[in-house]
Amino acid sequence: MASFSLSILVFFFSALVLVPQGFAEYYLYPAYRPPQTKPPVNKPSHKEPPVNKPPHKEPPVHKPPHKDPPVNKPPQKESPVHKPPRKESPTHRHPPAEDNIHF
C-alpha cells in the first residue's frame, strides 16, 4: 500500500511541476469593470413639420417704356428708281369683240 500512495504522490508532484499553470488555475471570467463613459442614448429625431409658406415673389415694379431720345437727322431723299412700264401678258387681255361669244 505504501508503494501505491508513493506513486500517487509522485504523480501529483510531477503534475504540478510539468503543468505550468497548476491544478488550481482554471479560467476565470474577467472582473466586471463599469464603463468609463455612458453609452449614447438613441433618441428619436425631433423634426418640426414644414410650414406651408407661399413662395416669396417680388412686387412688380412699374417701369416706363424705354424711348430713345430724338436724333436730329436731315431728311434723306430717296433717289428716283427707273421702272419700265408694266406690260400685261396676252392672256389677261379681253378678246376682241368679234371673238366674244358672250352676249
Swiss-Prot record:
Spans annotated as Disordered: 34-103
Major subcellular location class: secreted
Subcellular location: Secreted, Cell wall
Keyword Phosphoprotein in record: no
Tissue expression per record: Root nodules.
Region (11 X 5 AA approximate tandem repeats of P-P-[QVHR]-[TNKH]-[KED]): 34-88
Induction comment: By soluble compounds from rhizobium (in cells through which the infection thread is migrating and also in cells that do not yet contain an infection thread).
Comp. bias regions, Basic and acidic residues: 45-103
Cross-referenced InterPro entries: Proline-rich_CW_protein (IPR051308)
Keywords, ordered alphabetically: Cell wall, Nodulation, Repeat, Secreted, Signal
Cleaved signal peptide residues: 1-24
A cellular component term, taken from the record's GO annotations: extracellular region
UniProt keyword NADP, yes or no: no
The family this protein is said to belong to: Belongs to the plant proline-rich protein superfamily. ENOD12 family.
Alphabetized PANTHER family for the sequence: PROLINE-RICH EXTENSIN-LIKE PROTEIN EPR1, REPETITIVE PROLINE-RICH CELL WALL PROTEIN 3
Protein name per its UniProtKB record: Early nodulin-12
Organism (species): Medicago truncatula (Barrel medic)
